[in-house]
Swiss-Prot record:
GO molecular function: metal ion binding; protein homodimerization activity; sequence-specific DNA binding
Keyword Transcription: yes
InterPro entries per UniProt: Cro/C1-type_HTH, HTH-type_reg/antitoxin, Lambda_DNA-bd_dom_sf, MqsA, MqsA/HigA-2, Znf_MqsA-type
Gene from which the chain derives: mqsA
Effect of N97A: 50-fold reduction in DNA-binding
Name of the featured protein: Antitoxin MqsA
Cystines in this chain: none
Post-translational modification: Degraded in the presence of oxidative stress, maybe by the Lon and/or ClpX proteases.
Protein source organism: Escherichia coli (strain K12)
CDD domains (alphabetical): HTH_XRE, MqsA
Residue ranges annotated for the HTH cro/C1-type domain, each copy included: 74-127
Domain notes: The Zn-binding N-terminal domain (residues 1-65) binds to the MqsR mRNA interferase toxin and makes contact with the DNA phosphate backbone, while the C-terminus (residues 70-131) binds the promoter in a sequence-specific manner. They are linked by a short flexible domain.
DNA-binding region boundaries: 85-104
SMART domains, per database record: HTH_XRE
Temperature dependency: The MqsR-MqsA complex is exceptionally thermostable with a Tm of 83.4 degress Celsius versus 48.1 degress Celsius for MqsR and 61.1 degress Celsius for MqsA.
């Protein structure tokens, strides 16, 4: 079968590891079955192959999303804890202007900071334990 994209190469059944990037994070999706063009490397997958591919994509995206947080959430938790941006930066680290950058969406906190913010959102009384 000729490639439907480049019309030059033949489509050959194979298994490949596919590089994948989401929100600046990179991974390699392992063992992706499909038909691959020997010329342009385009791929065609049947439903089963596509479902397996998408399962890996969704799992990676979920792991990346678990490490990121919306700026609005950071503002909400900081205010819930009655902290200024400066106080929050002193407690959680990241530099003197860290929370300003996080709340504007210009930077993401370290994953450990995100986890701690999530815990404090549910249990604000624990703030005194980390001060």
């Amino acid at each position: 079968m000729k490639c439907p994209v480049c019309h030059q190469g033949e489509m050959v059944s194979g298994i490949k590891d596919i590089p994948y990037t989401f929100r600046g994070r990179k991974t390699v999706l392992k063992g992706i079955h499909g038909l691959y063009c020997v010329h342009c490397e385009e791929s065609i997958m049947n439903k089963e192959e596509s479902d397996a591919f998408m399962a890996q994509v969704k799992a990676f995206r979920a792991s990346v999303n678990a490490e990121t947080v919306a700026p609005e959430f950071i503002v909400k938790v900081r205010k819930k804890l009655s902290l200024t941006q400066k106080e929050a930066s002193e407690i959680f680290g990241g530099g003197v202007n860290a929370f300003s950058r996080y709340e504007k969406g210009n930077a993401q906190p370290h994953p450990s900071t995100i986890k701690l913010l999530r815990v404090l959102d549910k249990h604000p009384e624990l703030l005194n334990e980390i001060r």
